[in-house]
């Protein structure tokens, strides 16, 4: 195994040395010596040397205020460089890319070997493949965009250094560039000074498309084509759209007053502007490349007739002109200038597709397939994947905002208070109004600001070019009327198309009731007629885990999906399940392949729709090569889940999970909700209060400014526990429940479930990953430094529970150590721990010092923020 990681360790060592040189040049030998002493002590401490652990604590506690910031920055920047080397390792010929068989080809081999599948079954599954990745602006990307660009270039340099035939001067040039990039990073503030706006977040999303996905998606589809041809002898249809991207940036207003109707309108324009800009660049390349004169009669006519010498170029130049005028018009709109749209304004994907596809068909017909399947095919694939909107937008709003808006309308009209009506009365009113030809909204009525905002958002949707809005998601959906209310508000706004409206079920009770709600909805004739046989439902992972703990939440999510699949199948409805997963385990995060194969059978028939959140976007799609790998993983897993589904779990496994769910939920809530010491302990032992000062995202950390834990959003809740290494939301309750079932004599049954049921084995695997990242001595150190002594018994209780949980999980998985079956992740965690541990100790020290001061010193605060960023990099996830 050491050989497999030697190239990565060599890169980490080289980058560390270059960072050391930069620090020495900037701050002198003394600071570098101090950093190096701390690193060596940390490494020895990790190896079990207790004396060096105490020396590490003493050294960090004795740092002067002047030394705190440079030491924190050194370890934080080193972790960013380590992550970059690790990301390169996943795509390097010396790393994971070489040691793992190609993900697609191995999946296709498994499909071919199955005696139950015909080639037609496989072909149909491939051609109906649907992966929709929803990029969200959850405030978990802590690394500044300016630093991300530098780290991407560091990755490029590592790739160049891997070439065996480099001349000495070429290698020296690359090393010089690496030194420059590391020096630039060191002399750049790693902490944002101001909180990003929703428009800034949307621009970050567009930058991911421009810098990675624009190249990565066509490259992935070429790879898929080649693997299909090798395995089955056919290629993807040119118009296949296996991958699409949607965004919540600029559309997600749930709990974020900064996302207004005007912001959404602006982001929709910005998205179209960026699409026109990117397609214009593509077309300019094609103008240069498509210089051929031979073509079909149909194309010659399209190009302008027999006088045209270079018909392909003529068509490309016409498209170039159209894109230029579209770009100019959208630029004017973005600056607030009212201008008549040009006659050739690009509004639909077909306006781009038809001339490009005509060129493609002509080239194929004239024996120039090699040219057709080059950059022209890439552009056609981009039209299908991104299109004129670039990324479609989801609008998300909380259910009570719609209820309050309708209540204001009914009170004004003298119909009573909608909010106080029974569910059956609400439904009767909504169906009557949805079926009515007359408008509900009074003409000259002046609504309150909140209601006006809800209605204005619906009007933005109604006026948006068709295809630019993907869905309307209702958070905290609890009843059929929550869904019908949105349909009515959209109708009143003049929405002429049937926009998918997805209820989001996210608490334990709501997940348990999801099937009842959808059964009631599907029994309404008007609703069945309106949705035309298609329904989207979103499953919330983060809030359910915060509400009930991970074990109870994951079982409720599984059961809700299973019930919804069966209900929709029975009703003849095509169900798309939309998974609201986060990057961390406490918010539903899991390695993609394991997560997909652990879903209930049939859950991916309608395709995969899943959120990609915060820092996970960079880890999974930050480079074109990483994008190819991530999409290949998803593709292989979806095809296997649909064509080779796991067997239905046994009834007794269901019963064991019911018991695990009940016991774990009771224990989790016993601590989080019922123990009066828990909230004071949480506030003292974690940097929860200090996290609010980090300008991470546009959304406030709390739903209600003065609320307790229950009002805290799932992201800062998990972020805080990740920082002090107790990782509590990702395990509390789970191990105790497993122990109870073992004590009841069912260990063999648990081992069987772990062996034969992907859902359960994935849960155990996720617990192992959390335990590998958690750290008992660091969590104890936070308590000693920050927590009132009278709360220490609670901290000890939680740490003892964590230690017991680790033992029970190892007993069930029959392993001697954590992550035995995922050595790559274990190696990755071990590599980063040496640099994360000093940051944790430093963070506890900084929290201790800053909490002693009435007005914390600005340098102390900055150093604290740097440690938070560094620990986030070390843990590879924040919230």
UniProtKB/Swiss-Prot annotation:
Report the GO molecular function annotations.
magnesium ion binding; phosphoenolpyruvate carboxylase activity
Q: Record's superkingdom?
A: Bacteria
**InterPro entries (UniProt xref):** PEP_COase (IPR021135), PEP_COase_bac/pln-type (IPR022805), PEP_COase_Lys_AS (IPR018129), PEPCASE_His_AS (IPR033129), Pyrv/PenolPyrv_kinase-like_dom (IPR015813)
SUPFAM superfamilies to which the protein is assigned, alphabetical: Phosphoenolpyruvate/pyruvate domain
Quick check: keyword Transit peptide in the entry?
no
PROSITE patterns, sorted? PEPCASE_1 (PS00781), PEPCASE_2 (PS00393)
Catalytic reaction(s) noted: oxaloacetate + phosphate = phosphoenolpyruvate + hydrogencarbonate
CC cofactor: Mg(2+)
Q: Which UniProt keywords apply?
A: Carbon dioxide fixation, Lyase, Magnesium
Q: Name one Pfam family in it.
A: PEPcase
Question: What's an example Gene Ontology biological process for this entry?
Answer: tricarboxylic acid cycle
Q: Which GO terms describe its cellular component?
A: cytosol
What Enzyme Commission number(s) does the record list for this chain? 4.1.1.31
Output the Gene3D superfamilies linked to this UniProt entry: Phosphoenolpyruvate/pyruvate domain
| Active site positions, chain numbering | 138, 546
Q: What family is it from?
A: Belongs to the PEPCase type 1 family.
Q: What does this protein do?
A: Forms oxaloacetate, a four-carbon dicarboxylic acid source for the tricarboxylic acid cycle.
Check the record and name the NCBIfam families matching this protein. PRK00009.1
What's this protein's name? Phosphoenolpyruvate carboxylase
> Which source organism does the UniProt entry give?
Pectobacterium carotovorum subsp. carotovorum (strain PC1)
């Amino acid at each position: 195994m050491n050989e497999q990681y030697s190239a990565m360790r060599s890169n980490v060592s080289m980058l560390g040395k270059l960072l050391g040189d930069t620090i020495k040049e900037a701050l002198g030998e003394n600071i570098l010596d101090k950093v190096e002493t701390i690193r060596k002590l940390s490494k020895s401490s990790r190896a079990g040397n207790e004396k060096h652990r105490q020396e590490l604590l003493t050294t960090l506690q004795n740092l002067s205020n002047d030394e705190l910031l440079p030491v924190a920055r050194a370890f934080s920047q080193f972790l960013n460089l380590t992550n970059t080397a690790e990301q390169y390792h996943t795509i390097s010929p010396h790393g994971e890319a070489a040691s793992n068989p190609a993900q697609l080809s191995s999946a296709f081999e498994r499909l071919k070997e199955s005696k139950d599948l015909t080639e037609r079954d496989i072909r149909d599954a491939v051609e109906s493949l649907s992966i929709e990745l929803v990029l969200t602006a959850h405030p978990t990307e802590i690394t500044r965009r300016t630093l991300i660009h530098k780290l991407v270039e560091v990755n490029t340099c590592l790739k160049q250094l891997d070439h065996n035939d480099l001349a000495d001067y070429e290698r020296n040039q690359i090393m010089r560039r690496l030194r420059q990039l590391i020096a630039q990073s060191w002399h750049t503030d790693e902490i944002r000074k101001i909180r990003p706006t929703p428009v800034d977040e949307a621009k970050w999303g567009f930058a991911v498309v421009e810098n990675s996905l624009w190249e990565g998606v066509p490259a992935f589809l070429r790879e898929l084509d080649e693997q299909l041809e090798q395995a089955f002898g056919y290629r993807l249809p040119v118009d296949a759209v296996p991958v699409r991207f949607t965004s919540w940036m600029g559309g997600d207003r749930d709990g974020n007053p900064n996302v207004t109707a005007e912001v959404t309108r602006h982001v929709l324009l910005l998205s179209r502007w960026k699409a026109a800009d990117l397609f214009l660049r593509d077309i300019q390349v094609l103008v240069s490349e498509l210089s051929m004169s031979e073509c079909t009669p149909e194309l010659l006519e399209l190009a302008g007739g027999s006088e045209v010498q270079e018909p392909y170029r003529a068509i490309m130049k016409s498209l170039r002109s159209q894109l230029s005028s579209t770009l100019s018009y959208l630029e004017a709109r973005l600056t607030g200038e009212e201008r008549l749209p040009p006659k050739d304004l690009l509004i639909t994907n077909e306006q781009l597709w038809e001339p490009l596809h005509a060129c493609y068909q002509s080239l194929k017909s004239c024996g120039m397939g090699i040219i057709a399947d080059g950059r022209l095919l890439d552009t056609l694939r981009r039209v299908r994947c991104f299109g004129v909107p670039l990324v479609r937008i989801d609008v998300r709003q909380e259910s009570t905002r719609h209820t309050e808006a309708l209540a204001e309308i009914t009170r004004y009209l003298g119909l009573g208070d909608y909010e106080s009506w029974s569910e059956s009365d609400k439904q009767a009113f909504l169906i009557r109004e949805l079926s009515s030809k007359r408008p509900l909204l009074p003409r000259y009525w002046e609504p309150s600001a909140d209601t006006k905002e809800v209605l204005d958002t619906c009007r933005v949707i109604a006026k948006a070019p068709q295809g630019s809005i993907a869905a309307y998601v209702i958070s905290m959906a609890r009843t059929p009327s929550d869904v019908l209310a949105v349909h009515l508000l959209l109708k009143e706004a003049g929405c002429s198309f049937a926009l998918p409206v997805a209820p989001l079920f996210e608490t334990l009770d709501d997940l348990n009731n999801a099937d009842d709600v959808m059964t009631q909805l599907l029994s309404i004739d008007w609703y069945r007629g309106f949705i035309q046989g298609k329904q989207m439902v979103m499953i919330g992972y983060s809030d359910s885990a915060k509400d009930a703990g991970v074990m109870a939440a994951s079982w409720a999510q599984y059961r809700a999906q299973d019930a919804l699949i069966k209900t929709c199948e029975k009703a003849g409805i095509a169900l798309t399940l939309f998974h609201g997963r986060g990057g961390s385990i406490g918010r539903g995060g899991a390695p993609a392949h394991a997560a997909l194969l652990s879903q209930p059978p049939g859950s991916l028939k309608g395709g995969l729709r899943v959120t990609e959140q915060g820092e996970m976007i960079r880890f999974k799609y930050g480079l074109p090569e990483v994008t190819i790998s991530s999409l290949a993983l998803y593709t292989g897993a979806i095809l296997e889940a649909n064509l080779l589904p796991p067997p239905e779990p046994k009834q007794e496994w269901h019963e064991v999970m019911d018991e695990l769910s009940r016991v774990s939920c009771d224990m989790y809530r016993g601590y989080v909700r019922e123990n009066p010491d828990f909230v004071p302990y949480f506030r003292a032992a974690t940097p929860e209060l200090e996290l609010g000062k980090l300008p991470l995202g546009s959304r406030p950390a709390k739903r209600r400014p003065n609320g307790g834990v229950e009002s805290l959003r799932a992201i800062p809740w998990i972020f805080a526990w990740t920082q002090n290494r107790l990782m509590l939301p990702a395990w509390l309750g789970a191990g105790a429940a497993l122990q109870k079932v073992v004590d009841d004599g069912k260990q063999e049954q648990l081992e069987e479930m772990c062996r034969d049921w992907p859902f359960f084995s994935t849960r155990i695997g996720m617990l192992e990953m959390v335990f590998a990242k958690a750290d008992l001595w660091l969590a104890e150190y936070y308590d000693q430094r920050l927590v009132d002594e009278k709360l220490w018994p609670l901290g000890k209780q939680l740490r003892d529970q964590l230690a017991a949980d680790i033992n029970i999980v190892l007993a069930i998985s029959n392993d001697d150590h954590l992550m035995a079956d995922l050595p790559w992740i274990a190696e990755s965690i071990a590599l980063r721990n040496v640099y994360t541990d000093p940051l944790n100790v430093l963070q506890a020290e900084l929290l201790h010092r800053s909490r002693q001061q009435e007005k914390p010193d600005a340098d102390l605060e900055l150093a604290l923020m740097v440690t938070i960023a560094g620990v986030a990099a070390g843990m590879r996830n924040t919230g």
